[in-house]
Structure formats: structure tokens, C-alpha cells
């Protein structure tokens, strides 16, 4: 792709502008940036099918001629400290080890079943825990006092770093998790689930970055209601997706047609994890999940995100509230680890990426500049009262035991329309859901009927289902209406 651009005498910005124009011609509002083009050229991220088609059209070549390849695990990657894996393994094609080929194909088949049935599996996994811990039928579970009886605004509580203690007891490398990790090309079993994902079936967006892990929840301590430790994204995936894979192995019918009743039998890794509400026992990566409400005199509406299973490792193939993203710094630089340790700033970056199509702060560049647009505009809207942000509490996805920080952002109509005048139809993680044949709209009415229909569809992510239900129960507080 670099050679094609060089031969055309174009800059990365020229290519980005060209793709955006082609998107408009197709009726799609895109926001490709030069940084995004650079990451494609370097193989850091892999463009979606739409972007591959547009790139081919822009350069006047076939998709195959673009020369794009997914990242493949190399010996250096296998032995890097980032992956915590020891030993040096020379890469071999799976065909050179028939058992590895069979193991990986079987593993892919379970992943396919998992992504098809994530919602149903989460609801069934919730039945493994006490009924008092289940958040309705959402597929979420929460400890006593983790959910707030009355939503509180983000500014009314603080977060903090837990003292550095012992390393997590469960990391996903244990023998109890071996059955969910396929054989590697050399015939040895992958040491971590994240390495198996990257080696066998890498999602388009899959990079190991710094991430904060949930350590504790205590709403009686408003200055440090939520505490975290510093870890990595892959550390969370190693446990969460291993748990999900194990559940899919034993609870999806053999023909993939349905879900079997929940049972602890064969769930050796889940038993090893133990009490899910002791998050420091394992690397518990959390996401900020935000229900975005636009409110005017006619009522309230919200938007949903159709997350592409081939693009993301977590919550793929489901309808989710937006924005949602892992709680992590924008850069590996020390300054970002201080400035970005803030839930609202995490949400702002996700708004910029998911609503406006801005390039993701991939962790390998400069820290986010919160005075620059559009981030500065979000801060001004919060300060002026054009948006109010509430926290509903914290829960866990019962399937993965991934942390979910449930929030609601309430925008007045003019503020929403100004901030999101250039809202995109698709982004790196999926597409914005639209309804209506005559005049398609992304604005879904925030009503009991809409929530019930979405829940019955079986596609609503547990965090989305739980957030919508809790927001509806607390709508008078959130909307400020009687």
C-alpha cells in the first residue's frame, strides 16, 4: 500500500481525503485520517472490508494488489516481555503439524458459536450465580452495593489507584484453562488466550495496551469509590475470553442450534476463578459503557452500535450502547497515565472515535490533548450543563466476568446536535444502528416499548441491556422530570 501511495505521489492525508470523498459518493459519512492510513501501512491495524474496497478504488487496483496482511505472531513477538511468554518458537505453518491444524479449526468453530450466542450464553452464565446477584435478565451480575440505588453524577465521586500488592492469583495460564487454548503451530499449546487470538484468528482491532484493572468498588467512600491497578488489555482478555470460550464449549448444543442449561460441570477454569466479586484475584479489565440520551421537549432518544465480531475481541456480534471502551490511557507515556486516569476523559475519547470517526489513540503516540477539538468541546458542554453524566454503578458480564462501569450521558437537543453534527455511520468497531425504511434514523425512542423489543431480540449486549433497564428505572432522576 505504501508503494501504491508513493507511486501516486500522494501523502497519507491525500489518501484519507480521497477515501472520505468516495464514502460520500456511496452515501456514507466517513472520517478517515492520515494517522489511520499510517497505521494501515505499518500493519498496526487492518482496514475493514469497506475501507479495503475504497482503497482499491482510490488506487485503481484490486483488493489483493493492496498488499495488506494481518499481523502474524513472529518469534520475537512470542518471546517479548509484553506477552509474558517464555521460550523461543520458530514459526511453522499449521499444515506442518496436523494436530495443531485440527486443534485450531476446532477452536475457531467454538469461537464462531461463541460470537453467535454471546447474549444467550451470558444470560445462562448468570444462572450460575445467586439470583440476588443477577441484574434482571440482562446477563449482568453485580455484588450487593455495587449498583447505586440512585444514580450519581460523575463529579460527585472519585477514583483511585489501589496500593501495589501481590500479582493476580488467576491469569489464564493455568492448567485449568488449557482446554480453551489451541495448539500452536509448533505443536505446543498456546500459553495465553490472547496469543491464540492473535495467532489463529486476530480481530481487526487487537493491540496490547496499558489498561486499568478493577480492584474494588465501595460507594461508601466517595473520594475513592472505585479503585484500580495498572495492567494490560491482553491480561484481561486472557481470563475473560477464556471463561467465555469454556462456557461455549459446554453450553452450546453440538449442532450450534441452541443453549444448554447452565451447569458448573466441566467449568474448571470458572471454578478456579472463584468469587467473581473479588476482582483483584484476576486481571479484571473494565469498560466504560455509556447510554447516550438526546433530550428535548418531545422526549428522549438514544443510539446503538452494531459491533462487528471480526473487528473486536470483546462483545462482538452484539448491539451495544455507544460509546463504550476499555478504561485505559491514551498513550504509554507517563504523563498520559496521570492525565487519563479519569472516567469522563475516557468517555470523551470514545465519543470522538465512535461518534465522529476520529482515529483511536492507539497508545503508541502522544497523549490526548483535551484542550483540542473535539475533546475541548465535550468539556465545555459538561461545564455549561449542556450534558450531564451519571453513574448507575458497576457490574460484571456473567459470561466473561469483564467489568462494566455503567453510565448515562444526557445531552440537551441543541448541544447534541452541535457536537454530533458530523456523526459517522460506521467506525472501526462496527456500524451505527438505523431504523425506518422511508427516513432511516439512528435516534431510537427511549421508551419501555423500545427497550422491551431490543431485549427480546436476543442481540442486546448484557451491559447495554442492564444500562437501559437501570436508566429506565431511574429516568426521573436522570431526565429531571416527574
Roles of regions detected by a PLM:
Residues 81-294, 299-319, 452-482:
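Alpha-helical and coiled-coil interaction segments, frequently adjacent to or embedded
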Residues 358-372, 418-422:
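Short acidic alpha-helical/loop segments enriched in Asp/Glu that coordinate divalent cations
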Residues 13-28:
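DNA-recognition alpha helix
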Residues 298-364:
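Conserved Nudix-box catalytic region and its N-terminal flanking loop in Nudix hydrolases
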Residues 81-87, 366-396:
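Extended charged low-complexity segments that act as oligomerization/scaffolding linkers
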Residues 404-407, 418-467, 471:
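NUDIX/MutT-family hydrolases
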Residues 383-419:
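Active-site-adjacent beta-strand/loop module that shapes the phosphate/pyrophosphate-binding cleft
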Residues 1-4, 17-18, 30-88:
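Short amphipathic recognition helices of helix-turn-helix/homeodomain-type DNA-binding modules
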